[in-house]
Amino acid sequence: MGTRQTKGSLAERASPGAAPGPRRERPDFWASLLLRAGDKAGRAGAGMPPYHRRVGMVQELLRMVRQGRREEAGTLLQHLRQDLGMESTSLDDVLYRYASFRNLVDPITHDLIISLARYIHCPKPEGDALGAMEKLCRQLTYHLSPHSQWRRHRGLVKRKPQACLKAVLAGSPPDNTVDLSGIPLTSRDLERVTSYLQRCGEQVDSVELGFTGLTDDMVLQLLPALSTLPRLTTLALNGNRLTRAVLRDLTDILKDPSKFPNVTWIDLGNNVDIFSLPQPFLLSLRKRSPKQGHLPTILELGEGPGSGEEVREGTVGQEDPGGGPVAPAEDHHEGKETVAAAQT
């Protein structure tokens, strides 16, 4: 699969000394990339998970910058921003409107996108600007694709999906975690997962279902089993094909305190069109973990303590690739440094 390439493979293919061929120089590559992705989605129904398209756009953006095609790279970045829910089209909007985040489902991605916009539109003559761009693109590619999942599974990735699933569901969950991330799942596979959760549910603290190809209907199929896990604290559903419709279902089920009784976070980043989290969703999570004391949100510019209970605690609640929480940012610049450190 295309996204299995290593972080250095793109650099080897598009090194500064290499003369690109005519096909790779096409100025409308980004447009054809989007058209091909849309055509595949039309033929395959739900289509590929959106991270395939987004990673391809990041890699093409880096290639354009290496070739000095900053104007085209800026246009491609605009399309990537819109694909990720950052609908603004001007640089000022990107740098200032999104300098403080409100209820974003994936603040790490948005922070990296803002940093990319700065390097593309406001390049600094001093220092290794290209090296900084390459690092940002590596971080964004890593965050938007299942590289970390493949690395965690190590030996399992060489097996077929059914063998991987069987290995993970054999015995008790290690470290109280059911980690199926990166393993493509079918509706029939979910029956086995449901049976496993019912059998071992008392031991499960975390369920990882990122990059498994889940659709809204598949999540709804799992919800009865997931919502009754007594110790579950984190549920990862990132990198799938989920839409805002399932977010409404999750918000409704969280209104019942007997469902997901101990959950503190549900990761819905890098899906089709889930870009922000409604306050009822966040408040329901907060009620389940009052000692945590923070909503996973950053105040918008101009908002203050008088803006309401739901935005009184302005910190980002997310996890880095290693699974630990990222420290809250006091302002945008500090947040950028924190995120970069977490992704290095």
From Swiss-Prot:
A GO CC term attached to the entry: cytoplasm
Start and end residues of each stretch annotated as Disordered: 1-25, 295-344
GO biological process: proteasome-mediated ubiquitin-dependent protein catabolic process
InterPro entries associated with the record: LRR_dom_sf
LRR repeat segments: 204-217, 229-242
Record key words, sorted: Leucine-rich repeat, Repeat
Record-annotated disulphide pairs: none
Chain intervals with Low complexity compositional bias: 11-21
GO molecular function: ubiquitin-like ligase-substrate adaptor activity
Protein family (similarity comment): Belongs to the LRRC75 family.
Name the record gives this protein: Leucine-rich repeat-containing protein 75A
